[in-house]
Amino acid sequence: MAAADFPVIIVTGLSGAGKSTVLNVLEDLRYFTVDGLPASLAPQMVTILNREALSHYQGLVLGMDLRESNFVRNLEKSLERLQGMGVRPAVVFIEATPAVLNRRYATTRRPHPLESEGMGLEQALEQERLRLAPVRETADLVVDTSSYSIHDLRRVIQKKWSSIQGRIRSLRINIVTFGFKYGVPADADLVFDLRFLPNPYFVPDLRPLSGLDEPVAKYVLEAGHGETFLAKLLDFLHFLLPQYEAEGRYRLTIAIGCTGGRHRSVSVAEALLRALKKSDYAVSIEHRHMELG
């Protein structure tokens, strides 16, 4: 496995600074994440999790922290071994100010990892900062989370990481087809009504088929304004989807309906699915009423 075709990210930093939140953000960005991994095991993990096993993910993210004995030295050795394997991991270092970390620990009431060595919280925070200084100095990306909410942090990680790794499509799109006579899906964010298109139900040869069948799809898209509607819908979505991404949204449900949810909505939704996949979005489709229509 080479870095060029399978990105590897190592996320580390100060305890309480938000490493777990960052891992969750990267997981939402379609990375496979492993938290609490000893630094010494990073090369083995990269070897085990090959491209075929993670074919549906953007890359591999390994979360590590100071709880491991000799963490800094073990991380240095693992980075050297990974580079020898042709893998150049990007290191993301998460930090926050001492005042913010103190406040977070007071809120969560969890002990700092170094308090087990007999230190008080303030001393533990300072010692951790000193011990991890070499890692911070060589990190590809340093993120100070002191002033960020979870939603702010999501936007920052997506924006900053995109500048290093390239464009990341964070938005997951679910296309749902339905029949209006059965009701509009309650989870829909956008709803489009296709009942203005010619209905294959009234064509005897097409009635028993569904929008998954080529004759129906051809009829729906080529008769009336099917292709025109699809083109205008794509133009609209190509404008709208990046706006949702910029706001940190990671899920959007597009509902496409016709009378019974069997012919017109299915044909157009399948064409929309193919088009959006070409734009590298994570897209799924669900035909809720196709067998009822």
From Swiss-Prot:
Keywords: ATP-binding, GTP-binding, Nucleotide-binding. ATP binds at residues 13-20. The keyword Nucleotide-binding applies. InterPro entries: P-loop_NTPase, RapZ-like, RapZ-like_N, RapZ_C. SUPFAM superfamilies: P-loop containing nucleoside triphosphate hydrolases. One of its GO terms (molecular function) is GTP binding. It holds the Pfam family PapZ_C. GTP binds at residues 65-68. Displays ATPase and GTPase activities. Belongs to the RapZ-like family. This is Nucleotide-binding protein DvMF_0424. It comes from Nitratidesulfovibrio vulgaris (strain DSM 19637 / Miyazaki F) (Desulfovibrio vulgaris).
